[in-house]
Design a protein with these regions (language model features):
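Vicinal oxygen chelate
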Residues: 1-50, 54-68, 91-125
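Mid-chain, well-packed structural core segment of small domains
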Residues: 69-97
């Protein structure tokens, strides 16, 4: 029998796996003044660097190659120490890739919702 999490307890991925909240990605169709265009994803992103809560707005081109769940539902992103290990046993909808220097990220689906896992390479690693 699986035990249920109490209202005062953090989710399992935080409490037992050590995943750390990174950001919340929210799809939108409204252009924003501070957008950055990521051509290979057909995606405009904004808000991440200025939001005190880590909210990232994502506006997709119709031709975006990303998975439909990523384009239609908000996602939570967690920083993980070992991306490859974190992906074991997960349903991957966007395989590991490097959206920018020093960053590896992948998207999984959990209970029908997209979840992003991110790892960062440090100056010595």
């Amino acid at each position: 029998m699986t035990s249920r999490r109490q209202s005062h307890e953090p989710p399992d991925v935080i409490a037992r796996r050590g995943w750390r909240y990174h950001h919340l990605g929210i799809p939108t169709n409204i252009p924003r003044a501070d957008e950055t265009y990521l051509a290979r994803f057909g995606l405009y992103v904004s808000g991440f660097s200025t939001s005190p809560y880590g909210i990232e707005w994502m506006r997709f081109e119709e031709s975006s190659p990303l998975h439909p769940l990523i384009k239609s539902l908000p996602h939570v992103a967690f920083e993980v120490d070992d991306l490859d290990s974190a992906l074991i046993g997960q349903e991957v909808i966007s395989p590991p890739g490097s959206p920018s220097d020093g960053v590896r990220a992948a998207m999984i689906v959990v209970d029908g919702a997209p979840v992003e896992l991110i790892s960062f390479r440090t100056a010595g690693g």
